[in-house]
Amino acid sequence: MHMPKGFLSFGINIGIKDDTKDFGVIYSEIPCKATAVFTKNNFPGAPVIVGKEHVRSGVLQAIVINSKNSNVATGEKGIQNSREICKIIGESLGIKETLVLPSSTGVIGVPLKMEIILPACKKAKSLLKPGNLEEVAEAIMTTDTRKKISSRNIKTKSGQGTIYGIAKGAGMIEPNMATMLCYILSDVSLPEGTDLYSILKSSVDQSFNCLTIDSDTSTSDTVALLCNGLSGESSVQDFSKALTEICIDLTKLIATDGEGATKLIELTISGAKSEAQARKIGKSILNSPLVKTAIYGGDPNWGRLIMAVGKVFDEPIPFEGLQIYFGTLPVKEANPETLKKLSEYLKNNTEISLNVVLNVGTISMKFWGCDFTEKYIEENAYYTT
């Protein structure tokens, strides 16, 4: 994958929890046009509070991330710690602290180990290497089992530019504005006056906001976009298309890596009367433990799907017109022969296509999730012990 020009980074272990990478910095040689979307959880993490302040100007030049500790529910001291991290990173890189976006992910309610984080911040400049974003993708992982990376090359007036995205997330995921942690870096610029926030929000709404693993909205969700323009100007249309594709790629990688997951579920809701209706029903289906466990076990129990559609009380769907398919196989009122084929489809595929046709309108949307296994219970029952 091509790396965007002008970005340097590193990802290292500093011992926050164990011997895996847990600290990373991304730095642009010049200030970037920037925007971000954040969690709507009522208890946002300290880095989210500080990050909102710093991105308000529309300019950022660096991102600092630690994993294994989210700096959430840590009070005023947690906010002070996030500010101090930005200050020391800024001093190391020779930039204003307000040009630094902080992020933290991991266990909630535990103070940051500032005695090991601040020395790492002081060394930041000496650790930077050109590109190197795969290291950061590893450093932001918590219960993730793999790095999540996607990129696209796009045309610019002076040749070609790159958009490069990294993300983390495997549990505590049902976004409401952003989701998990995601950093998207680009060396292209956009025409003067372009609303970068609207472009990012549109891409997020078509991707991360259509994702759920366990219906829990994290306190740390952040999606940030930084563009330094070193490869020239791109059209808004080309940029938006590539950005949305990257966000969908990362969404699917997160769903595939859901804690304990064995199957990616891609759900299409079609024939909805509105996007709001499609979202409610789509999330109801993918959040249902009964649906998720049935898919895991290869059990084509179509009654559970009917239940998940029907429990959206404020969006009643006529039963007669409702159609449901796994792949191309009809589910509703399936006969024994079809049920056998459905079971084989669920058992033999790691990517499950689920199509629900409401037949009350013309709106169509895609959603992503995963199955629900014993390993999810094991992972989360003993997370802090």
UniProtKB/Swiss-Prot annotation:
Gene Ontology CC terms: cytoplasm
Record-linked Pfam families: ArgJ (PF01960)
Active site: 179
NCBIfam families in the cross-refs: ArgJ, PRK05388.1
Record-listed E.C. numbers: 2.3.1.35, 2.3.1.1
GO MF terms held by the record: glutamate N-acetyltransferase activity; L-glutamate N-acetyltransferase activity
Main function: Catalyzes two activities which are involved in the cyclic version of arginine biosynthesis: the synthesis of N-acetylglutamate from glutamate and acetyl-CoA as the acetyl donor, and of ornithine by transacetylation between N(2)-acetylornithine and glutamate.
Signal peptide start-end: none
Site positions per UniProt: Cleavage: 178-179
Ligand binding (substrate): 142, 168, 179, 259, 380, 385
Main location: cytoplasm
Quaternary data: Heterotetramer of two alpha and two beta chains.
Site (Involved in the stabilization of negative charge on the oxyanion by the formation of the oxyanion hole): residue numbering on this chain: 105-106
Gene name as annotated: argJ
Family, similarity comment: Belongs to the ArgJ family.
Compartment list: Cytoplasm
Reaction(s) the record says it catalyses: N(2)-acetyl-L-ornithine + L-glutamate = N-acetyl-L-glutamate + L-ornithine; L-glutamate + acetyl-CoA = N-acetyl-L-glutamate + CoA + H(+)
InterPro entries xref list: Arg_biosynth_ArgJ (IPR002813), ArgJ-like_dom_sf (IPR016117), ArgJ_beta_C (IPR042195)
Keyword Lyase: no
Keyword set, alphabetical order: Acyltransferase, Amino-acid biosynthesis, Arginine biosynthesis, Autocatalytic cleavage, Cytoplasm, Multifunctional enzyme, Transferase
Protein's recorded name: Arginine biosynthesis bifunctional protein ArgJ
Record carries keyword Plastid: no
